[in-house]
Design a protein with these regions (language model features):
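Active-site alpha-helical segments that house and flank conserved acidic catalytic motifs
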Residues: 59, 72-98, 154-155, 187, ...
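C-terminal charged capping/lid subdomain of soluble metabolic enzymes
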Residues: 40, 284-340
Length: 340
């Protein structure tokens, strides 16, 4: 069980990232930026919401565990958070999600075309936020290395998302394929957040690479947890329950089942996922087959394996104090809704 003070620390770091994001946008008044503020949860409407800045907090946690100065790392924490939000806006358009964080999605309020502008604008702002490092006295070479980390991660994430979409019409995706895609789609940006935090602490390649591995594996664990919820739990933010299943996304429980099923079940799953359009009734059939194959337990076990591996990647680093539980606490919070 995660102690209450852990959540207070997480919220403190999230608030610091939020403040840095507001500075990034404070001088921009065009309605385009109001769309961004709305997505970030800042507008003054009655349904404004507080949103956890997961990637920014991860960045600051890595920085603190590398004995860094958090104030120096705030620009990169804001930058990686902006990239994540750019992806969220595009995700909602792509999947047809009408809501995000309990209220109307940006595209549902302003239309897809303007939402694309808002998302792309956030990506540009992320790169500009990086240059605030120079205002804090960070050397040019470190600033440009940080920018390279961010661009590499954004590109890897796009590659993973491309492969994820390509897989929708295929039934020959293996678990190994899935893990590669999840590492790129979900793990690359979280790994980037970790690398940026370590980089801004002045640590060398060994520490940066350890945090890179930590972030990638934690991202995979988070993706598996999201997949489990899509199959077995209702998602209040979706346009319909199990939206990813209806969109024929190859979630881990489905990939595992197709790969390991006997011919009869394999054929039945193939018939469903080769349909042009899936119907809600198909989900009941899919879930029944997955339950027969114990796909949930397999997925939960693999998620926990990746979470444990992520933490273990950092235990050999001499800079990580054994009594400092912030890494364990971070992974617990980020995976708290995983059914493990």
């Amino acid at each position: 069980m995660v102690r209450p003070d852990t959540f207070n620390t997480f919220q403190y770091l999230s608030d610091r990232v939020d403040a840095e994001l507001k500075v990034t946008l404070e001088d921009r008044s065009m309605p385009l930026y109001e769309m961004m503020r709305y997505h970030l949860g800042w507008n003054n409407s009655a349904n404004a919401t507080q949103i956890a800045r997961i990637h920014g907090v991860t960045c600051l946690t890595a920085n603190q565990n590398s004995s860094g100065d958090m104030n120096m790392a705030l620009p990169v924490a804001a930058a990686v958070e902006l990239v994540d939000n750019f992806v969220q806006i595009h995700d909602d358009i792509q999947a047809g999600n009408m809501t995000r964080n309990g209220r109307d999605a940006v595209w549902w309020v302003w239309g897809p075309a303007q939402a694309i502008n808002a998302g792309d604008g956030m990506h540009a702002l992320a790169r500009l936020a990086m240059f605030r490092l120079r205002d804090r006295g960070v050397p040019v070479d470190i600033t440009f290395q940080a920018l390279r980390f961010l661009d590499d991660a954004a590109l890897a994430m796009c590659e993973g998302r491309f492969q994820d979409l390509e897989a929708q019409e295929r039934i020959d995706i293996t678990v190994e394929d899935y893990l590669t895609i999840a590492g790129m789609k979900k793990g690359s940006l979280l790994a980037c957040a970790c690398k940026l935090g370590a980089l801004l602490s002045g640590r060398g390649e060994e520490v940066i690479e350890a945090f890179n591995s930590f972030g990638t594996k934690l991202g995979i664990a988070m993706q598996i947890g999201e997949d489990i919820r899509q199959v077995w739990e209702s998602d209040n933010d979706s346009t319909a329950p199990h939206n990813e299943v209806l969109n024929k996304k190859k979630l881990l429980p489905i990939v595992y089942s197709i790969q390991t099923a006997e011919v009869r079940e394999k054929r039945r799953l193939g018939e469903i996922f080769m349909k042009r359009v899936l119907e809600p009734a198909d989900i009941t059939t899919v879930r029944s087959i997955l339950n027969e194959l114990d796909a949930r337990r397999y997925s939960e076990s693999l998620a926990e394996d990746y979470r444990s591996q992520a933490v273990n990647d950092l235990t050999t680093l001499s800079i990580i104090h054994k009594k400092d539980k912030s890494i364990d606490q971070l992974t617990s919070i980020l995976t708290k809704s995983m059914p493990i």
